[in-house]
């Protein structure tokens, strides 16, 4: 299955990686690794994560307070948010897959 980030989700991901790398290079690498693991889980088992809104699901990022919010559009997994779980709940709800 293909994976695609909407532009706002890509910005969130880039900003989160940058912030963690500013804290320490090692932390940035760990964050990147955990997000990549979450993406692999989604690609392997797209329907296994919790359904949170209509056709959207959330895959938790291990060891970090982030969730990947995604929908499944035919043969593509569309990540609509890389959401920090302690900020602005459901801010991503109006984003389109």
Please identify what each model-predicted range represents.
Residues 1-32:
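Arg/Lys-rich, positively charged N-terminal/basic patches that mediate binding to nucleic acids
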Residues 8, 46, 59, 87-89:
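Short linear/disordered segments characteristic of secreted peptide precursors
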Residues 18, 28-30, 50, 55, ...:
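Solvent-exposed interaction patches of small proteins and small membrane subunits
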Residues 39-43:
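Short proline/glycine- and basic residue-enriched helix-capping loop/turn segments at helix->loop/beta transitions
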Residues 44-77:
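Basic/aromatic recognition patch in beta-strand/loop cores that engages polyanionic ligands
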Residues 67, 71-97:
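Enriched for short, Lys/Arg-rich terminal
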């Amino acid at each position: 299955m293909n994976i695609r980030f909407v532009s706002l989700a890509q910005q969130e991901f880039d900003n989160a990686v940058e912030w963690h790398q500013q804290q320490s290079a090692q932390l940035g690498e760990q964050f990147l690794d955990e997000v990549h693991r979450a993406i692999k889980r989604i690609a392997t088992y797209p329907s296994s994560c919790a359904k949170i809104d209509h056709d959207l699901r959330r895959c938790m990022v291990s060891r970090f307070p982030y969730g990947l919010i995604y929908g499944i559009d035919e043969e593509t997994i569309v990540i609509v948010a890389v959401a920090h779980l302690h900020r602005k709940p459901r801010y991503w709800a109006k984003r389109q897959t």
